[in-house]
């Protein structure tokens, strides 16, 4: 399976880019192997939904914590989404 994003390493973090052309069907529920902190660099209207919670609008500059092995997914917004990811 091909990932619906592109990663670029930038020192101690990576920039993950989701194209505006990504299909909503590719943005599946999943779990990560490590704890992560993310923040939005670019994008509007995208949402993060954690397991058993309502979707939350992603706000540029706000820090979001994602615990390892916790189910979550992105919900597509408008345009491209770029997030900065720190693995813990």
What do these predicted ranges mean?
Residues 3-18, 82-88:
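Double-stranded beta-helix
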Residues 13-33, 65-68:
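Conserved short histidine dyad/triad with adjacent acidic residue
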Residues 23, 44-46, 71-72:
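Short Gly/Pro-enriched loop/turn and capping motifs at secondary-structure junctions
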Residues 28-29, 34-35, 60, 70-75:
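A structural signal for the main folded, soluble domain(s) of proteins
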Residues 31-47:
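Short, conserved beta-strand element in jelly-roll/cupin
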Residues 49-52, 77:
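Short strand-coil-strand connectors
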Residues 51-70:
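Short acidic-glycine-tyrosine-enriched beta hairpin
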Residues 67-88:
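Ligand-binding loop in jelly-roll beta-barrel domains
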């Amino acid at each position: 399976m091909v990932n619906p994003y592109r990663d670029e390493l930038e020192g101690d973090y990576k920039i993950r880019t989701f194209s505006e052309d990504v299909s909503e069907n590719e943005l599946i529920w999943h779990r990560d192997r490590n704890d992560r902190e993310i923040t939005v660099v670019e994008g509007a209207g995208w949402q993060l939904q954690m397991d058993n919670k309502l979707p939350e609008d992603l706000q540029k500059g706000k820090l979001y914590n994602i615990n390892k092995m916790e189910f979550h997914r992105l919900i597509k917004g408008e345009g491209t989404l770029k997030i900065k990811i720190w693995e813990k």
